Amino acid sequence: MKNYKKKYLASKNLPMEVHEKSTFYGRRCLYCYEPLFESNSDFHEACNKRFFGQLKTPQLAYNLENLQELATQVIQSQMAVTGVQAKVSLSLYRKQEKNLTKKLTIVGLYGDYILKPPSEHYVQLPELESVTMHMAAVCGIKVVPHSLVKLQDETLCYITKRVDRTRKGKLHMEDMCQLSERLTEDKYKGSHEQVAKLILKYSSSPLLDVSNFYEQVLFSFFTGNTDMHLKNFSLLEKEGQGLNLCPAYDLVPTALVNETDTEELALTLNAKKRKLKYADFLAAFENGGLNKKVLDNTLELFLYAKPEMLTVLEKSFVSDVYKMKYAVLIESRYKQLGLK
């Protein structure tokens, strides 16, 4: 994790007005959230290059209505990417002239990108997933490449780049459902301690990956993510490096969009999913071969990172109402573990 201790302590001594939120962000890049001053695009050229591999934003020739129709057809033909949330697989159309801006097209299972349109049931899912991924990144948690992108009708969607695909082919990747030999429908049955044991068994960097895994678990707790089930943790094999914990993906603050859910984590932690305390995380850490010092150091780093998380939240595309709700949620979860 990143260490913001010096910045955190310095900010404590600043006059109050320095802490006030900026009221102007103007047009911002959908990839990095930083201002766009001269471009008519929704991305900086460098951000386009980094995420799409070209200087111009690819054309996404769908509006929300026909995208949902196509997504339904894909699901019915069993080509959709697995998961409850509607999502489709995309690739850049390669049969175009080199000087033309490439299009993103639906390709079934074997695309390079996964697109998630807005939900019919939950508000602002793309914006909330995007900012949560950004918050994880500022904490120093590795995340898969991701961005927001606009459809033709200006609807915002969440898009992520697959990490198990390269120009050379497919990389070996197994989620915890597969490694524990459970059926997909049993993805909520299990514990974080069982996942840690699987990481210790199969990872080429076992203790480091268990530590990184519990950083993701703590982050999920702090951000109200109750959907980090067995399929949302994976091991990814890179050439010559063996299997290691996959960068974080599917980070959604479900507690914000589904207020009826009283659970705090998707899998059990110290045999609990609710009313989690410091002692529960300590028991889980120790069960995975990590000691109290590792937990305390990790929590300290999360404390120092909180202002950075809230700054990212303020710059995001989330509505003001949900920015406030999200900030309150984060504050309450920090206090629940004794962090202030």
Task: Tell me what each language-model feature is.
Residues 90, 136, 176, 227, ...:
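A residue-level signal for conserved active-site and pocket-lining positions in enzyme catalytic cores
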Residues 120-137, 186, 191-256:
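Conserved kinase catalytic-core segment
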Residues 171, 177, 252-260, 289-291, ...:
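C-terminal regulatory or interaction extensions
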Residues 152, 157-222, 267-271, 283, ...:
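ATP-dependent phospho-/nucleotidyl transfer catalytic cores
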Residues 252, 256-301:
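C-terminal hydrophobic structural anchor segments
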Residues 149-155, 295-305:
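Short linear loop/turn motifs
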Residues 1-68, 72-75, 287, 311-340:
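Regulatory N- and C-terminal appendages and interdomain linkers associated
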Residues 66-187, 245:
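Conserved ATP-binding subdomain of kinase catalytic cores across diverse folds
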